[in-house]
Structure formats: C-alpha cells, structure tokens
Amino acid sequence: MKSYQRQFIEFALSKQVLKFGEFTLKSGRKSPYFFNAGLFNTGRDLALLGRFYAEALVDSGIEFDLLFGPAYKGIPIATTTAVALAEHHDLDLPYCFNRKEAKDHGEGGNLVGSALQGRVMLVDDVITAGTAIRESMEIIQANGATLAGVLISLDRQERGRGEISAIQEVERDYNCKVISIITLKDLIAYLEEKPEMAEHLAAVKAYREEFGV
C-alpha cells in the first residue's frame, strides 16, 4: 500500500465516509463496512479528494486526453481532479460532464465543459452495478471518443450477481482498465496494521471469503 492510499483511508475514516460495523447494502448483503463518498461535502474535503484522485491517475500511468464526470456525483470529482492535476502535477487537462436532462435553450446538448473527444478518463465515486458507466459509454461513443479508463475511489472487490464483480464486468465489456484509489485488499492491509481494529479485521476477512473475487 502506498502512502497516499493509507492517507486516503485515514481521510475517509476521519470524515465518516468509511465506517466499520454492520450495514445492509442495497443488494441485501450484510457488510462489515460502508463507504459513502457523499460525505466528502466541504471545500476542503473536495480539494483533498481531488489530490487523491490525481495521485491515483498519475500512479496508474494510463494516458488520456480528457476527464469525464458522469452526472451527478462524477461532476465535482472531475472538476476537483482537473484542478489537482493542474496544481500538483503540472497537467492542464480539459474536463467535461453530462446533464441528466437536455437543455432546450442556450448552449445546446447535454454536455458541459470541453468537447468530448480523444481518450477519455471517466471518474466517479464507486461502481455498484455499472449502470452509470454503461450510460456514460453511450455518450462517449456517440461523440466519437474512446474510453481510456475508469477511476473510482474504492473497489470493493466483491462478486455481483454472477461470479465476477461489476468492475470486472465493465473491464470485460468495454476492454478498459478500472483503477481505484483503494481496494478491499488495501483496507485489509490497513486494518492489519491496527491491533485495536482486530474485531473489524476478522469481520472484513470473513466477508471477503464469502463474497470476494
């Protein structure tokens, strides 16, 4: 685990974005941890979040021309990541996002920001069922652009309805790489460093045994 990944876990814990306990997910599964990126909700949170996304992007080595944030959660993520890339990595890249509802006046279409072209890096909070990615792919392809990769904050590394995860499905269906700031494996490595969290470590490991990929 790299230092920025450890810092991201501590940041998420401090904001209660990441919690350990017992939570029922939308899928009905009982999970020993919960991640709610919506709680990164102040200016400082967003500034820090952008730095972590930018760090993971640069670390990945994936080449891309533009950041795309799917509405709605992806919009602030794309914006803050673009700022962080410019301020901390000297990479001044365009960004773009979509509207959920098409405008009938003013600037046309359902896209805001730079023209959607070239190699696109899609940024979002998490991938649960992959629906937002599929909708975004339609927009990207309709504009003649290509998907360079997808970056999310957390990869839960767990099976969907079948034997593979929603993330593995996206990688298979769109022949692209999905990267994340942290994974379930990183969470477990972090818990292993904290003796006072042994109870949570056991629960998360048991969950991975049952649902992990």
UniProtKB/Swiss-Prot annotation:
Q: Which purpose does this protein serve, as stated in its record?
A: Catalyzes the transfer of a ribosyl phosphate group from 5-phosphoribose 1-diphosphate to orotate, leading to the formation of orotidine monophosphate (OMP).
GO MF, one term, reads: magnesium ion binding
Q: Does the keyword Thylakoid apply?
A: no
Q: What is this protein called?
A: Orotate phosphoribosyltransferase
State where 5-phospho-alpha-D-ribose 1-diphosphate binds.
26, 72-73, 99-100, 103, 105, 124-132
**PANTHER family, alphabetically?**
OROTATE PHOSPHORIBOSYLTRANSFERASE 1-RELATED (PTHR46683:SF1)
Q: Which NCBIfam families match?
A: pyrE (TIGR00336)
A GO BP annotation? 'de novo' pyrimidine nucleobase biosynthetic process
Please tell me one Gene Ontology term that the record gives under cellular component: cytoplasm
Gene3D superfamilies (UniProt xref): 3.40.50.2020
- The EC number on file is 2.4.2.10
Where would one find the signal peptide in this protein? none
EC main class here is transferase
For activity, the cofactor(s) needed are: Mg(2+)
Q: How is this protein organized at the quaternary level?
A: Homodimer.
Q: Where are the transmembrane segments?
A: none
What Pfam families does UniProt report for this protein, alphabetically? Pribosyltran (PF00156)
Asked whether the keyword Acetylation is assigned, the reply is no
UniProt binding sites for orotate? F34, F35, T128, R156
Highest taxon of source: Bacteria
Q: Which organism is it from?
A: Shigella flexneri
